């Protein structure tokens, strides 16, 4: 199933905004005092990066 370019672009923008929020949280040294929270944020960050990469690949498809 192919989503329209506009939908994919909005999805990328939304995920990139969430990624920036996670980057802000991960930049806070206090986060690392709670290992479980830090692991959760890193897991979410990695998942979002993979989703964004996949969306960019779909956007590049003819």
Where are each of the predicted segments found?
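Charged, heptad-repeat coiled-coil alpha-helices that serve as long linker/dimerization "arms"
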Residues: 1-62
């Amino acid at each position: 199933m192919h989503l329209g370019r506009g939908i994919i672009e909005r999805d990328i923008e939304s995920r990139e905004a969430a990624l920036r929020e996670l980057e802000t949280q991960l930049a806070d040294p206090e986060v690392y005092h709670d290992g479980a929270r830090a692991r959760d944020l890193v897991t979410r960050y990695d998942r979002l990066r993979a989703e964004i990469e996949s969306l960019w690949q779909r956007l590049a498809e003819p």
